[in-house]
Amino acid sequence: MEILMSITAGVLFMVGTYLILTKSLLRVVVGLILLSHGAHLLLLTMAGLQRGAPPLLHLEATTYSDPLPQALILTAIVISFGVTSFLLVLAYRTYKEHKTDDLDQLRGSADE
């Protein structure tokens, strides 16, 4: 299962990097979203997957599984949601202002 999750994280990184390098502003935002999802999946995979294991392993509660990776991923998801919404607002305002989402046209020429 961890192999499949690692491959999926790699595919998300690959597609996210490809989309970041394109000319469309919306594709860049989607690429950043996929890159952050790949990072979340990688962190979850690195924590180790235990199918059906409860957080408390015994009733005595002296040994328990580590909740830190899940808390870290939850925090990262909330932060990436805020960054994504901010990037979407910036992309929308840029499109409304310049009437294009092509990064080459937004960059301008050397004469300007």
UniProtKB/Swiss-Prot annotation:
Entry GO CC: plasma membrane
Membrane topology according to the record: Multi-pass membrane protein
Coiled-coil features, chain-numbered ranges: none
Spans through the membrane: 4-21, 28-50, 70-92
Other observations noted: Mrp-dependent antiport apparently occurs by a secondary, proton motive force-dependent mechanism, but the similarity of several Mrp proteins to membrane-embedded subunits of energy-coupled NADH dehydrogenase complexes raises the possibility that there is a capacity for electron transport that could provide a primary energy coupling option for Mrp functions.
NCBIfam families to which the protein is assigned, alphabetical: PRK08600.1, PRK12660.1
Assembly information from the UniProt record: Forms a heterooligomeric complex that consists of seven subunits: MrpA, MrpB, MrpC, MrpD, MrpE, MrpF and MrpG.
The keyword Endoplasmic reticulum belongs to this UniProt entry's keyword annotation: no
Gene Ontology BP, a term: proton transmembrane transport
UniProt similarity note: Belongs to the CPA3 antiporters (TC 2.A.63) subunit C family.
Domain of life from the UniProt record: Bacteria
Protein name, per record: Na(+)/H(+) antiporter subunit C
InterPro entries: CPA3_antiporter_subunitC, NUOK/Mnh_C1-like
GO molecular-function term, one example from the UniProt record: antiporter activity
Xref: PANTHER family: ANTIPORTER SUBUNIT MNHC2-RELATED
Function: Mnh complex is a Na(+)Li(+)/H(+) antiporter involved in Na(+) and/or Li(+) excretion and Na(+) resistance. Na(+)/H(+) antiport consumes a transmembrane electrical potential, and is thus inferred to be electrogenic. Does not transport K(+), Ca(2+) or Mg(2+).
Species of origin: Alkalihalophilus pseudofirmus (strain ATCC BAA-2126 / JCM 17055 / OF4)
Location of this chain's protein in the cell: Cell membrane
Keywords, comma-separated and alphabetical: Antiport, Cell membrane, Hydrogen ion transport, Ion transport, Membrane, Sodium, Sodium transport, Transmembrane, Transmembrane helix, Transport
